[in-house]
Amino acid sequence: MKKTLATLTAGGLLVATLAASHQGATGIVRDRMDGMVAMRDTVRDLTPMMRGRTEYAREAVLDAAAALERHAGETMTALFPEGSDDAASYARAEIWQDWETFEAMAMRMEVVAGALAEAADNPPGSAMPEPVDNSTMMGGGPSMMGGGTATEPDPEMLAQMPVDRVFTVAAQVCSACHTQFRAARN
């Protein structure tokens, strides 16, 4: 009974938080917020499996990869036209000031999502580590995930990796982009 009540309370808080977080967002800002929520939920739902806490399900990985890919690349960048940084948006001005890096990260997510689908047949190699402070690796500096002068991830190499490691790369791309281009919530 207590567990059910806690679950219902948590679910209610999540719905209220989502409603409040999108309050006032309309049009393209609302569309991109909805896309980001879909990506966040995809990563959240797959994380226990990638950490070895639930049974591995190839179809769930394929569905997750498709969801990430559907919201990445040009689909993502099209939702950030200049002038769409209204008060309801968490988008920082740096997106438009450093469009090349933002666009590269969106394209990188598309590549990594495709590689995640390809890696779905590869058994998990090691459980995804618990979150650590990756601010140096995933920030705005020249690193594989943070943009700059580093080489782009090789889709063929990623596709050969254990699926949980490719998932970790996808999560790192999300984190790097948010670190550089997303304003903190109030």
Regions found by a protein language model. Give the residues of each.
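Bacterial N-terminal signal peptides that target proteins for export
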Residues: 1-9
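Bacterial N-terminal signal peptides
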Residues: 8-16
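Extracytoplasmic entry segments of secretory-pathway proteins
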Residues: 2, 16-26
